[in-house]
Amino acid sequence: MSSRRKFIKKAALGTVGISTVFNTITATEKKAAITNTKKVKKPVIISTWRHGLAANEEAWKQLKKGVSPLDAIVAGVGIPESDPEVRSVGYGGLPDREGKVTLDACIMDKNSDCGSVSFLQSIKHPIAVAKKVMENTPHVMLSGEGALQFALSEGFKEENLLTEKSKLAWEKWLENSKYKPIINIENHDT
């Protein structure tokens, strides 16, 4: 267990290390870094995962067509959500310990309005549902059965999102899983 004293010591050492690195950067390098950040033109699309590259590409295509940035993002995110080879989101995503593909997504517009869904099952495009939550409800988040019922009321269709590949990976995980059963088994995710 880490004590407060150890934490403060590590934080202080980290600060010294970071400041040492920054002090070794030349004035020219500092100016170049600042100058380069000012050259960035809007809009900017950033992804944190490799499968986000296809999402970025689609979002740019949509922007070039004149689609709103928000709709372009939804279209872009829809690409990995539909890809059965992407194991972290959407169709093809790895299931939870019960073998169910549960998804989440969130979105925010330029006015800081936002919408999100969590523990959503059977809906391929949670990002599109999150956008509907933002636009059509007073809520910021819908979860579980409430998110599913809302999605269905908005015209989304239920689909089996568990691909054979993900099912096999889950079954293999079950063979050696050391997951401790949760106490709260009444369909709660908290």
List the predicted regions and their residue ranges:
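Alpha/propeptide regions of enzymes that mature by internal proteolysis
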Residues: 2, 9-12, 16-17, 31-190
